Regions:
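A surface-exposed partner-binding patch
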Residues: 1-109, 153-159
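Alpha-helical interaction segments
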Residues: 37-39, 118, 138
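Residues in well-ordered beta-strands of folded domains
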Residues: 102, 113, 126-128
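Broad, structure-driven detector of short, well-ordered beta-strand segments within folded domains
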Residues: 108-116
């Protein structure tokens, strides 16, 4: 198991230990995850996929992770990262190889840069803002989704 997936397992344990401070869905099956990847034209890294399988979408102590989910009101459409990524492409010019995983009041969009995969299939996490001039000006906020999610969940629980 890679360090990024180990971090995701720690997020799962943290969420399970703090059920009173969090909300989550039931998780995604392989068919839903494959459909989400096809719709975006991107592949989930293993650490994000593990959390999507477990929760689908989740929120802990006010920190919302989009994930992937469907709702009856959505008419079967894939929501969360899929909807946010496709919408950001259409509305604000999000590059096609970035995947939205969170929107934050400090960083604007938190994205995975799928053009920079490592040997484990993990992508670095960046803050992306429609006003940025080029990739070099994006702020790196995590080495992988798993490590980023763990840090954010721990920070949210400590406040």
């Amino acid at each position: 198991m890679t360090r990024a997936v180990e971090a995701s397992e720690r997020v799962i344990a943290l969420v399970r230990e703090n059920e009173d401070n969090m909300n989550h869905a039931d998780g995604c099956d392989v068919e839903v995850l494959n459909a989400a990847e096809r719709e975006m034209g991107l592949v989930f890294p293993p650490s994000y996929r593990r959390l999507l399988e477990e929760f689908g979408t989740w929120e802990i102590a006010g920190k919302e992770f989009f994930g992937v989910y469907k709702s009856p009101a959505g008419g079967g459409a894939l929501l969360g990262s899929v909807e946010q990524t496709l919408e950001a492409r259409r509305q604000v010019g999000l590059p096609a190889d970035l995947m939205v995983v969170m929107v934050d009041d400090v960083w604007a969009y938190v994205v995975l840069d799928t053009s920079r995969g490592d040997q484990d299939g993990e992508y670095p996490v960046f803050a992306w803002n429609p006003g940025l001039q080029g990739r070099d000006s994006m702020e790196r906020v995590g080495e992988s989704f798993g490590s980023f999610a763990l840090e954010e969940c721990q920070r949210a629980m400590s406040t």
